Amino acid sequence: LVALYNDSTGVNLNTSFISQDTLFPSYSVPADLHLFPATFYEDMDHDGIKDLIVSPNSSSESADKESIWFYKNFGGNNSPQFYLQNKNFLQENTIELGRESKPLIVDINNDQILDLLVSNFGEFDLSIPIHYNSYIESYENVGTNENPIFKKISSDFQNISSQINDINLVPTLG
């Protein structure tokens, strides 16, 4: 993310950029998203001061997890000072597997309580040739069928991703 600063003396049509921060905000943790970051200047914590949200603005080739970066503004609306608070704002208390997630409700441990399997198209990863790694996560229902409470059991149910090594896995039963 690049911040461009203009001089404060010119009229909008005649103003020029006088400095830039190519690792914005360089005084904190720079907002370094792989492709086409979108920024939002909104009061996210209801303290009356606008904060900064940075997230991917692309439907592909971008991170699926930790993809909503929340920077709290410790300055003011006219002189913001943004400091990273977390990289998974609004995602931290959810089951987040990224794009094209596919859930399947099934009793995986034969306790008569329905559990959860969730797959995805693939998690974005620049280090692998096709840039995506698909897997199935499993969640045991430690509550009841009427009031489910899901506890994550495995990030790769039955080690399927290493056996199949493909994208767009879909959990099914027959």
Model-derived features: positions:
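Acidic/hydrophobic-patterned starts of short beta strands in beta-sheet-rich repeat architectures
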Residues: 1, 46-56, 110-120
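Beta-propeller fold detector
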Residues: 12-24, 80-89, 148-158
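Short glycine/acidic-enriched loop and turn motifs that connect beta-strands
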Residues: 58-61, 122-126
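Acidic, divalent-cation-chelating loop motifs in proteins
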Residues: 41-47, 105-111, 173-174
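A detector of repeated loop/turn-to-beta-strand junctions in beta-rich toroidal repeat architectures
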Residues: 64-68, 131-135
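Short loop/turn segments immediately following beta-strands, especially the blade-tip
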Residues: 5-15, 74-80, 140-148
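Repeat-based blade/solenoid architectures
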Residues: 23-40, 91-104, 156-172
